[in-house]
Amino acid sequence: MDNHKIPLLGHTLDELKAIAVDNGLPAFAGKQMAIWLYDKHVDTIEEMTNISKTNREKLAQRYEIGAAKFIDAQYSKDGTIKYLFPTESGKFVETVYIPDRDRATLCVSCQVGCKMNCLFCQTGKQGFEGNLTAKDILNQIYALPERQKLTNIVFMGQGEPMDNLDNVLKVTQILTADYGYAWSPKRITVSSVGVKGKLKRFLDESDCHVAISMHTPIPEQRASIMPAEKGLSIEEIVELLKQYDFTHQRRLSFEYIMFGGLNDTPLHARQLVKLVEGLDCMVNLIRFHQIPNVNLNNSDEKRMETFRDYLTNHGVFTTIRTSRGQDIFAACGLLSTAKKIAGRENSGEHQ
């Protein structure tokens, strides 16, 4: 990949048409480029054979496809694969491929590190190192060896999607547009802790599924483990969500990591049921995966099942999520590239 050239990957149809016109090509060449990119997945401009050789050479002077192959992969005993991809800024980001019988989910990242600093998340301990570009996000799909097997994409990797909303929306547009991947929005879920102003914009502009990181229904307690609560409270989030329809195409879920003795009590179950009353939603209970220097513990299986049963019996559909990739630190809350970046810088491999 030539760092002096502009990547075509990550551009919308309108942007590709503008690139075509700016370089003396007809506007319809933008549509041709989109097909070669998002349908054919070419590696070079030279492969765009329905564009004249002269015009391909003209484009190649300033542009390239821009796809970047993964530079490391870790394989879990359960079939999960964690990939390490380089970014345009020379940093690195992790992506997790999760096969499961007839489904294959890709957990993509949208930032290097994260600003949210949730107590229980390893990514937050890394600090915030920058937003991924639309190209960086899309490259995690474009350059994935198992790309053709994918059935679902979840924005649940490193970073807060609402904190990089322009690029997240741009990527979901390319994924769902006829000129792009032509995926149904039902195949894409975007998670968020809830960011003031940004969550509403996402709900207004996207039809993708929404997953809200709740982790406790009690505002004061949520603020103690999730600083974002102070910007947009869980009660304000729920009131906002009640303004939208989740009874048809778009699905709403709440993510709830279970901490032993902290948020797994009958009181929390009752408060959660009361909080989401009137919302068409589901709750995903998640096992806590221990991270260094954090005084939190996982809830035991019996308490998780009791919590699930209470919610289900009170009309809130609830599941206990199966942990995947824990042996390669690919499970929920474990993604971090801090040590990998430092290691490559020390060895002279940092790009």
Language-model features: where?
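Auxiliary Fe-S-binding modules of radical SAM enzymes
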Residues: 1-93, 242-250, 258-351
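Canonical Radical SAM [4Fe-4S] cluster-binding loop centered on the CxxxCxxC motif
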Residues: 99-136
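Generic beta-strand structural signal
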Residues: 81, 93, 104-108, 116, ...
